[in-house]
From Swiss-Prot:
E.C. designation(s): 2.1.1.244
PANTHER family, per database record: AD-003 - RELATED, N-TERMINAL XAA-PRO-LYS N-METHYLTRANSFERASE 1
Name of the protein this chain belongs to: N-terminal Xaa-Pro-Lys N-methyltransferase 1
Gene: NTMT1
Catalytic activity, reaction form: N-terminal L-alanyl-L-prolyl-L-lysyl-[protein] + 3 S-adenosyl-L-methionine = N-terminal N,N,N-trimethyl-L-alanyl-L-prolyl-L-lysyl-[protein] + 3 S-adenosyl-L-homocysteine + 3 H(+); N-terminal L-seryl-L-prolyl-L-lysyl-[protein] + 3 S-adenosyl-L-methionine = N-terminal N,N,N-trimethyl-L-seryl-L-prolyl-L-lysyl-[protein] + 3 S-adenosyl-L-homocysteine + 3 H(+); N-terminal L-prolyl-L-prolyl-L-lysyl-[protein] + 2 S-adenosyl-L-methionine = N-terminal N,N-dimethyl-L-prolyl-L-prolyl-L-lysyl-[protein] + 2 S-adenosyl-L-homocysteine + 2 H(+)
UniProt main location, coarse: nucleus
Binding annotation for S-adenosyl-L-methionine: 69, 74, 91-93, 119-120, 135
Residues bearing the modification N-acetylmethionine: 1
Biological source species: Ailuropoda melanoleuca (Giant panda)
UniProt enzyme class: transferase
Amino acid sequence: MTSEVIEDEKQFYLKAKTYWKEVPPTVDGMLGGYGHISSIDISSSRKFLQRFLREGPNKTGTSCALDCGAGIGRITKRLLLPLFGVVDMVDVTEDFLIKARTYLGEEGKRVRNYFCCGLQDFSPEPNSYDVIWIQWVIGHLTDQHLAEFLRRCKQGLRPNGIIVIKDNMAQEGVILDDVDSSVCRDLDVVHRIVRSAGLSLLAEERQENLPDEIYHVYSLALR
């Protein structure tokens, strides 16, 4: 439980916001110095996502996606824009969203909205998104705020839409990172929060070929 490791919720959010303001708006900055893993990450994400986009009666649409904790648009550029007609981005750091406009290049014209907002305060437009992608950002929300955000995301899905969480998972319990003011939860804790938000797990996969010294990374598809 985040309530056991976060002493002051207001400070938890403020400290994270301050931390990201000092991070350079680059791929390396977004990935905490692990920019070299970006291609491995995107390639696996594409395979994971495409199983839901294939032909079939319940296939997920490709009209519109939402990139949560989007930063400068690394995932929007490499994963979402090639697969979806329109993408919206949301991030708490305004400088990242400003940088995104040049980083995304010509294809960036298909980014419809740049929302500058913390996810704890963000509500996706109901019935708007085929895919809501939430990567390396759930650790910046308390358990309660994460459950509430996922409930709002559920409302934001179009028919056959999915939510994807891709994030670090701890071996056991909840670990606080005091540097960037985030938490890392184990899979059981994340599963519990997902269930409390009224979502079902459709698929789960561990990311392969990452450096040994970093946390295990899992993708979860939810509806």
